[in-house]
Amino acid sequence: MLTRHLATIAALIAAVSGAAAQSAAATAEQHVAEGDSAYAAMNAPAALKHYQAALAIDSNFYPALWKASREAVSLGEFDTSKVSQKTFYSMGETYGRRAVAADPKDTNGWFVLARAIGRNSLTLGKKERVKFAKEIREDALTSLKYDSLNAGALHVMGRWNAEIMRLSGISRFFAENFLGGEIFHAASWDSAVFYMQKAVKLDPTRLVHHLDLGEIYYDRNKGNDRALAKQELEFVVNGKDTEYNDPNYKKEAAALLAKIK
């Protein structure tokens, strides 16, 4: 009899624990859904708070991890405080690393990690920036291994090629020695254009793809590149805002467009 009662109690405890776990998971999912709504409304601060609330319930909840990384980096991108910007970028990288640990075979974790490291590296001098180039490339390529049509990872690869090609003098020498000749010489303006054009084709309403493609055309400056740059930049200036940082992207596009006109 006692054994039967103990078994019944154990079963009840297991059922309650299971129900609690399901409830927590549902709540985490609810916070992610609310974060997604805030993201769609271009409210990055609110989106990040919801994703963080989900992680407070389940610290390894993959959708919340990679999306929290995305929003943290977006918040840091145009932050005028270098300290605050660094904090957001570090937060984005931390969430990205936790995301790939939680699900190493999904494309989005690797993409946001590459993006976070890439954005953080752009705050550094060119020589210091090179030290992160290898990991950025590896993470972006891993993302593309799991989804060759991930527009964000394609964007990172386009930007990676462009940043290597923008190096000059001692920075270029340092990059070749640090990355190794095979990786360094794999970078080209044509590859930068190829990857960014694919990102634009896959996600044509996203203004940042057009902005960076315009900047690549402007810097490559081959043939009718300046006319192509103008076309992309005008698209950004006249395009519809769909993301938190689009107003800032429009300002950058307008400033570069003024140099062409």
Functional labels for PLM-detected ranges:
Residues M1-H5:
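Positively charged n-region of N-terminal signal peptides that target proteins for export
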Residues A7-S17:
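Bacterial N-terminal signal peptides
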Residues Q22, A28-E29, L167-G180, A186, ...:
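Terminal, low-structured helical/coil segments at or just beyond the last alpha-helical repeat
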